[in-house]
Curated annotation (Swiss-Prot):
Entry keyword set: Amino-acid biosynthesis, Aromatic amino acid biosynthesis, ATP-binding, Cytoplasm, Kinase, Magnesium, Metal-binding, Nucleotide-binding, Transferase
Domain of life: Bacteria
Principal location class: cytoplasm
Subunit and partners: Monomer.
Claim: Transport is one of the keywords in the record: no
UniProt key word Acetylation: no
Taxonomic source organism: Nitrosococcus oceani (strain ATCC 19707 / BCRC 17464 / JCM 30415 / NCIMB 11848 / C-107)
Family: Belongs to the shikimate kinase family.
Single GO molecular function: magnesium ion binding
Cofactor note: Binds 1 Mg(2+) ion per subunit.
Gene Ontology cellular-component annotations: cytosol
Record: residues binding Mg(2+): T17
Name of the protein in question: Shikimate kinase
Taxonomic lineage: Bacteria, Pseudomonadati, Pseudomonadota, Gammaproteobacteria, Chromatiales
Amino acid sequence: MLNFNIFLVGPMGSGKTTIGRYLARITGKNFYDSDREIESRTGVSIPVIFEIEGESGFRQRECKIIAELVQLNNIVLATGGGAVLAAENRRELSQRGIVVYLYAPPKQLYRRTSHDNNRPLLRTGNPLERLKCLLKERDPLYREVADVIIKTGKQPVKAVANEVLRQLRQYKGGAPQRKSFVHVKSNKGA
């Protein structure tokens, strides 16, 4: 049994919400998405929060939500792509569960996000270039906090979730030691 929380980090479009829901279902854990929690509690969408409060206002809300959610037990939490920007979020995630970094290359992220109007940071003339810049800035932070790194590429949700579980099951008898393993799933052609 996986008796620890699973926290998913990674760029927008890496599959955190989709894979997180699937992981929660097959492990019997409760699923939370920090962005959806923010929307639910404010009653408005993320783009509206960005319009009214700017990115800094949104990040403050995100820190509060993450600090609250990581106190729960038996959960899978999909964080927003920029959650790792705040040192307190990285600390909270590291201390309260196992952090899985879902990595995908920028072109794959672009294909997954290009038709989603709910992503204020991609409202730019060149969303692919913006994704590349965001990944360059955030990748070191994702890697810093990650216990496990999984390359999602073009793999189906079930395959990625099963790879996450395979890695997590290597820990037997309680919560794992941080940084005990890191695995990058190769996916040639992605």
